[in-house]
Structure formats: C-alpha cells, structure tokens
Amino acid sequence: MTSVQSVTCCCLLWLMLSVQPITPGSPGPAQLSRERSFKFLSGGFKEIVCHRYCAKGIAKEFCNCPDKRDVVSPRIRRRKRSKAM
C-alpha cells in the first residue's frame, strides 16, 4: 500500500468514525459533523485527495471541485512554471 493510499484509508476511517450514531429516538439518518469534516487536512494532502476524488465525482461539497474535469491542477502548473524558468 502506497503512502497516499494508506493516508486516504486513514482519512476515510476517520470520516466513518465521525458519523453520529443513530439512537432509537433520533429522527433521520446518521450524518457527518460538518465542523470536523475535511478541515483537518493540510493544504498539500487535501489537494492530492481532492484532486483524485473530484476526478471521480466524489466529495464535491468538501473539496470545492471545479466544474471542468480537464482543469490542470495547481501542482502541475507549479511544476511547469519551474521547468520553464
């Protein structure tokens, strides 16, 4: 398992554990606590995870995914800029 996969796995596990359990008297389904979801991620890691999930159409509300799928990520733009100089 690569480091990105293992960190992604840990994040998904954390999100699963963040789900509020349903008690017999509670109305509606279990929901993620919006205050804690994806705010713990650092910029670089969030960029990698969100880029992957946006391409698959997952986690749009957490990642602020662009509408276009062929948008070049900031990471690639930085790499191209540094090679051009």
Swiss-Prot record:
Residues 1-24 form the signal peptide. The keyword Secreted applies. The keyword Signal applies. It is found in: Secreted. Contains 2 disulfide bonds. GO terms for molecular function: toxin activity. Residues 25-38, 68-85 form a propeptide. Expressed by the venom duct. The modification 4-carboxyglutamate is found at E47. One of its GO terms (cellular component) is extracellular region. The modification Aspartic acid 1-amide is found at D67. Keywords: Amidation, Cleavage on pair of basic residues, Disulfide bond, Gamma-carboxyglutamic acid, Neurotoxin, Secreted, Signal, Toxin. Causes scratching in mice. Belongs to the conotoxin J superfamily. The cysteine framework is XIV (C-C-C-C). This is Scratcher peptide. It comes from Conus geographus (Geography cone). The lineage of its organism: Eukaryota, Metazoa, Spiralia, Lophotrochozoa, Mollusca.
